[in-house]
Amino acid sequence: SLSDSFMSSLEHNGVYQLLDPVSGEAIEDIPAEPIFEAIVDASWRNGDPGVIFADTIARDNPVPELGQFGAVSGCGEQIMIEHESCFLGSINLAAMITHQQQNPASVDWEKLGDTVDTAVRFLDNTYEASTFASEKIARVSKLGRKIGLGVMGLGDAFYILQIPYNSEKAVEITREIVAYIKRRAYSCSEALAKEKGSCPVFSSASHAHSRRNATLTTIAPTGTISMIAGCSAGIEPVFRLVYLRRLASGKHLLEVNRNFIRKAFEAGLDIPHIFKDLIRGHKLDELKSVPQHLKQVFVTAQDVSAEWHLNIQRAAQQHTDNAVSKTVNLPCNADRREIRQIYLKAYQMGLKGITVYRDMSRDNQPLSCSGDSSLLDAWLKANGY
C-alpha cells in the first residue's frame, strides 16, 4: 500500500513517515527509495507483492460516511471498510458478441444490458440468501449493500471482434463496454431502490440519487471461474494460444484457444503443426505459415507491452466503482528497471493498483509452455487431427 506521501518522497529522493498500522502513530522518518527498491526486487523475484495506491483509492470512495477503507481483497480489486463484505460476479464478454455470416462481429448491447440487469438483481439478492460469519459483518455489509459486477473474457472477445489487444481500438471498446455496464448497473440499482428500498447509507438527504447498492462494479481476476466459462481471465489478454495449466495435484491440463482454431481452420492452416511449434514456446509471429492478419489479431500476453496493459487497465478503471485487478506479464529477461517504471507509470495514470509477473520467476508457475507435447498429441488425436 503506497501513499501519495510515499510516492512524493520517492520522486524527490526524500523521507516519509513510517506509521503504526494499528494506532496510526508516526514511528520514524525513513528514506522512500530503499523501501521501493525492496518492493521492486521482490516483485522481480517472484511477482509479489503487487501494489495498491491508498490515497488514489481513498479519493474515489463513493460513500466516505461509511468509514475509511481498511482492507483490500487479495487480488486488489475490492476495497472494503472494517467488517465489510462484498459479493462479486463477472460477465463473460466473449458470450456478448454477435457474429453473423454476412456481417462483422459486434457487441450485442441488448444482450449485455439484459445480462447486467439480471446480474445486479442476482448479486443484490445474495445479501438475503447468504449466511454471514458474524452479526457485525452482516450489519456493516448491509449498510452499503455493495456488489461488484465485473467482466471476464475480454481477450477472447477481441479475438471474435478481430481487434488486436494492443491497439487504440481495443482501448476504446474496453472503455465503451465498461462504461455501459456501469450505467446499466446504476439504472438497475436505482430501480431496485424504488422496488425494495435503498441501502441505509443512501437514505440520507445528502444523496440526491437513491440506489440499492453503494457500489456496483469491480473487475476481478477470475482466474478460476473463467476456466468454468471457457474464456480468458478478467480483462487480461489470452495467456497463450496453447499452454499447460498446472493443477494443485501437480498434474497438467492442456488449454487451447478455440477462437484461434476456428480462424486457423477457415484459413486452411496446418493446426497440429502450428500448435506443436507454439507448445515448444515459439511465438505465432515467428511462424511463416500464419497469415499476417491473424498474427496481428491473435496476440497473447507475451506480445503485449506494459504500455498497452496499462492503457487497457486505465480504460476499465475510469468506469469502475471499485478497482481493477490486472497483471502486466513480462518476459523472463525483464529487469528491475522495467518493473520500477510500471509501478511509477501506474501511479501517474491514476490506477488503484497493479501487479507484475516475470515469466519463470517461480519454479512451479500455474501457466506455462513446455517442450513436452504428449498432452497436445493426445488432444490432437482425440479431436481428429
What name fits each language-model region?
Residues 6, 10, 14, 39-44, ...:
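Structural signal for hydrophobic packing residues in well-ordered secondary-structure cores
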Residues 43-141, 153-157, 231, 236-258, ...:
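Function-dense linear segments that define catalytic or interfacial modules
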Residues 1-61, 65-67, 90, 98-103, ...:
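Conserved, charged catalytic cores of large soluble enzymes
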Residues 1, 5, 27-35, 70, ...:
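Conserved active-site and cofactor/substrate-binding residues in soluble primary-metabolism enzymes
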Residues 70, 74-79, 89, 123-128, ...:
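Catalytic alpha/beta core of large soluble enzyme barrels
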Residues 1-6, 53-63, 136-147, 171-177, ...:
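A glycine-rich phosphate-binding loop feature that marks nucleotide/adenosyl-phosphate handling sites
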Residues 22-23, 115-138, 142, 161-222, ...:
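Internal maturation/activation junctions in enzymes
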Residues 17-25, 93-110, 132-142, 159, ...:
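Glycine- and acidic
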